[in-house]
Amino acid sequence: GVSSAASDVYKRQMCFGVMQALDELGIKAGSVFGTSVGALHAAMYAQGSMDAAAALWDNIRLSDVVSEESLAIADDAENIFDHPEKLLEFITRYAHQKGVDVSPLMEILHRLIDEDRVRRSGVRLGVVTTRFPSLAMVEKRLEEMEAGSLHDWLMASASCFPIFPMKQVGGDRYIDGGFCDNTPVEMAVRSGARDIVAIDIGKHRSHTQYDRRPNITYIRTSQPLGGLLTLDSALSARNRILGYNDVMRAFGRMRGVSYAFDAVDAQALYTRAHHVV
């Protein structure tokens, strides 16, 4: 079966463009692995409710989940995703931060994600989080999670400290999985996935060792997607189109770099231009 390794902080609407394209291509994932918001989307995909996920980002207001103080920290947090060697310094700097009250976000997750439905789906689910204070990467698969703990593990993966508080699960504290691995393609590989579609929205190239694996389609975003906490309807619509186009290019249905053309139209344009020249 096909496995999808979802990157994050997913720039939200790009995910839905990606899933729309995969659906049109007839690609159904038997396993989904996600980090941070990508973990939330992975769970929603597993239970077959991506429309609900789209509605979440279409209707949520930033003020529902973060404070103005958190917005000021967002740029620093996003830079750390690209420079993990500075993570300890970053955590120390903001150690006094308690983060915002995430109970409204947890209520949204409980409303949108039904753990029993996810477990019955037959889709294998995995998430990445970061244990604190060791900063060790933790990969957690659905079958390893205690009954009733799925939402806790999803929040552990998406606890972008210090914007959000650390998440305690069992006796350990966790922060955002993106601090360790923003694109859990290696988790998919270790889980035995045969054919993998990996979506990487990071600013810098990562996991380049998988670029030429015949069983891995590694898709990197072709354009900047906006900031960590950007909630803008026009940007969201653009990102959805970018996600769709990037997947279609990767599977040969579209051509182009900065622009995307239907593969047949692109060949016709090339032929016409060649005759003109």
Question: Model regions: which residues?
Answer:
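C-terminal helical/tail subdomains of lipid-metabolizing enzymes
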Residues: Y218-V277
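Patatin-like phospholipase
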Residues: Y10-K98, V102-S103, L109, E139-M155
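Short acidic, glycine/proline-enriched helix-loop-strand junctions
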Residues: R205-L225
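Active-site-adjacent alpha/beta core region of enzyme catalytic domains
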Residues: D75-A198, I216, D246
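Generic secondary-structure signature for well-ordered alpha-helical cores
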Residues: D58, L62-V66, D114, S159, ...
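Residues in the short beta-alpha loop(s) of Rossmann-like NAD(P)-binding domains
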Residues: G202
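Single conserved hydrophobic/aromatic residue that forms the stacking wall/gate
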Residues: G1-A6, Y10
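Conserved strand-to-helix beginnings and helix N-cap segments that scaffold or border functional pockets
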Residues: C15-F16, V185, S233
